[in-house]
Amino acid sequence: MIKVKWCGFDFGQCLMEPTSLRNPLLFGDIFKQLGQPERIKTTIRKYRILKEKYGDYSVMKEGHREEIMSFVLDGDQEAMDLFSIKEKEMLQPGEGLREALVYLTEQKTDINVVSELKKTLGPMTSNIIIGFLNRNELTHFFNELITPQGKINVADGSVDSSYKGLTKQSGTIYDKLREELAQRDILPSEAVIIGDKPATDILPAKERGFKTIQYVGYIDFGEVGADYKISNFLELINLVKGAVM
């Protein structure tokens, strides 16, 4: 059991379960619905090229979503609008997430999102993560959204630009976060990062003293040295306990 005052969740393949969107046939469905079946083959080929370039849908979604729109969908407004609708319909929270968030809230833990979201297709406060939390009625559990674009206060929408340009993979987001938590008398060992990717969620956070929990409910990258490994968020109830602030 680890005692923590602060908790940061990754978004893609962690809070957000993108299984349905891994299937390139989704793009075929879009052009069938638009009455343009002749575009399906080329669109699916472009999607596969982009997936090969970045490795997985969640990476594309968080950092390169504009390329899905411009390259895969050719900037076609109708196709982009339909993709956004289907995307919202298909994205679901990870298994056991709501129950875990209720528990962490009861434990007086400060709950946040720490994402590698590098670009948005609109105002920062209307990004894909905020939209996901709103649609699934999860927003009230979270205090801040920390990204390379800035830190958003979920309650009032204000943006702290001091995080702009920092990233999880380089570790600079964790450096900044460690400094801020120190001002609140929270040690890195009293904060936990929960995510799936070794290079962004586990290794750089652990190197800076944060507790780490590897989520393998969507994809398991193997043993990467995390303090704990979970496949269902309900497991957090037996792993994490709130520490008195």
What are these regions (language model features)?
Residues 1-9, 17, 32-37, 75-77, ...:
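Asp-based, Mg2+/Mn2+-dependent phosphohydrolase catalytic module
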